[in-house]
């Protein structure tokens, strides 16, 4: 069971990294970042249950990471929406935000 969960977490993490590197759309990049965080959460819960199933430290930390990821997604989408309203595009390669 441990191997299957870790392999799934590695696949999710790899897909997220690949999508983040090759993404040209800001919304897609945010979704890939969320996929990476979910892969990390899966590994946290898996290791927590494998090493000591009586303590819920990994589960609690995973809930904390989910809360932080939700806040990050809300702030990220608000920034993308503001950029879209000003520039009418969400493509990453069209921007130099330091001049914005």
Swiss-Prot record:
Its main location: plastid. GO terms for cellular component: chloroplast thylakoid membrane; NADH dehydrogenase complex. The chain crosses the membrane at residues 1-21, 31-51, 63-83. Keywords: Chloroplast, Membrane, NAD, NADP, Plastid, Plastoquinone, Quinone, Thylakoid, Translocase, Transmembrane, Transmembrane helix, Transport. It catalyses: a plastoquinone + NADH + (n+1) H(+)(in) = a plastoquinol + NAD(+) + n H(+)(out); a plastoquinone + NADPH + (n+1) H(+)(in) = a plastoquinol + NADP(+) + n H(+)(out). InterPro entries: NADH_UbQ_OxRdtase_chain4L/K, NUOK/Mnh_C1-like. It is a multi-pass membrane protein. Its EC number is 7.1.1.-. It is found in: Plastid, Chloroplast thylakoid membrane. One of its GO terms (biological process) is ATP synthesis coupled electron transport. It holds the Pfam family Oxidored_q2. GO terms for molecular function: oxidoreductase activity, acting on NAD(P)H, quinone or similar compound as acceptor; quinone binding. It comes from the Eukaryota. NDH is composed of at least 16 different subunits, 5 of which are encoded in the nucleus. HAMAP family: NDH1_NuoK. NDH shuttles electrons from NAD(P)H:plastoquinone, via FMN and iron-sulfur (Fe-S) centers, to quinones in the photosynthetic chain and possibly in a chloroplast respiratory chain. The immediate electron acceptor for the enzyme in this species is believed to be plastoquinone. Couples the redox reaction to proton translocation, and thus conserves the redox energy in a proton gradient. Belongs to the complex I subunit 4L family. This is NAD(P)H-quinone oxidoreductase subunit 4L, chloroplastic. The gene is ndhE.
